[in-house]
């Protein structure tokens, strides 16, 4: 039905002081990428309207990929690391990744293997709803 909303994959993350941060799938980012960017922006007190990574940085990376339509968390972390060399705000935000250790996160879908590995490497505890990320899997 036209009146039904399109289902969006989302991850919610509880920060150490209890604030809940969410990340949803966008045209460029996976939900895991979005939630981590949003979390480090919150911890760094970077306003929501400021992009840590410009779409002009992300789009060429995405064009190199043929089998997926969003950038994984690992790809976004690499892009942040590269950009941090010339951008002190990004460098400061990346330092906040350590604060996410042992935080709890909940996904509305089964997180893809690549994002799952990246979240585990950040030591984030994740639970998932039993819904596939993509209908192509079914």
Placement of each model-derived feature along the sequence:
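Short, basic/aromatic recognition patches
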Residues: 1-10
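Short loop/turn hinge sites at secondary-structure boundaries
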Residues: 1, 45-46
């Amino acid at each position: 039905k036209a009146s039904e909303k399109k289902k969006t994959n989302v991850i919610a993350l509880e920060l150490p002081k209890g604030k809940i941060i969410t990340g949803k799938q966008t045209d460029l980012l996976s939900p895991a990428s979005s939630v981590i960017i949003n979390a480090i922006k919150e911890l760094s007190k970077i306003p929501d309207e400021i992009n840590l990574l410009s779409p002009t940085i992300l789009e060429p990376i995405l064009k190199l990929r043929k089998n997926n339509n969003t950038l994984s968390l690992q790809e976004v972390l690499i892009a942040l690391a590269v950009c941090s060399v010339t951008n002190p705000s990004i460098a400061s935000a990346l330092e906040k990744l350590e604060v996410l250790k042992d935080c709890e996160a909940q996904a509305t879908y089964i997180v893809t293997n690549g994002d799952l590995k990246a979240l585990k490497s950040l030591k984030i505890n994740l639970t998932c709803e039993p819904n596939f990320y993509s209908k192509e899997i079914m």
